[in-house]
Amino acid sequence: MPAKNKNKTRRSPKPQASRMRAPGYGFPEGTKGLLPWSWADQRLKKSHNYWITTIKAEASLTSPHAMVVWGLWQDGRFLFSTGSKSRKARNLAQNPNCVVCTEHAQEAVIVEGVAEIADVAARRKFLPVYEKKYKFDMGKMKDDILSMKEPVFAVRPLLAFALWEKHFQSKSTRWKFESPLSPS
């Protein structure tokens, strides 16, 4: 499994916005028209289903594996639970790099990040919000999640992209997140 996130780290409150780099797509120069981070943050919070892409853990297979998951955008990270024997969990144990996407492609938010095992405090915060959002009783799974028997992953963003179909050329935005700083 990826390393447990034992240290509290401080992060920049907002990532740095810039124009996407995609030659041939007609994106304008400069920063006029870039979307604010709040646009992406809102869509990450409101999405019901998310796509997560991991890299297959088997040595002979290096192709991506995409799957729909339920989760939360909470405290600047994407949190989701999965069985410890699921392909996602096995893949993330070997390679914590992943991509998370919101469900609506016409207002897409794509997050490239690193998955870490969420600590107990994050899990305690995650569970009631998750159950309310999905109207889903985690039942006995709560004990396994809180006792760390089953994983809850927290994807720490490194880069994020917004692609708004209606304003594709003028508003497509890229955000770069600061690396975590030393513990506070």
Describe each region flagged by the PLM:
Residues G26-W51:
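Short, basic/aromatic recognition patches
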Residues A40-D41, A89, L127, K142:
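Short amphipathic alpha-helical segments and helix-helix/interface helices
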Residues S86-R87, A121:
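A generic structural signal for alpha-helix starts
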Residues H48-N49, N97, K135, A160:
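Generic structural signal for secondary-structure transition and capping sites
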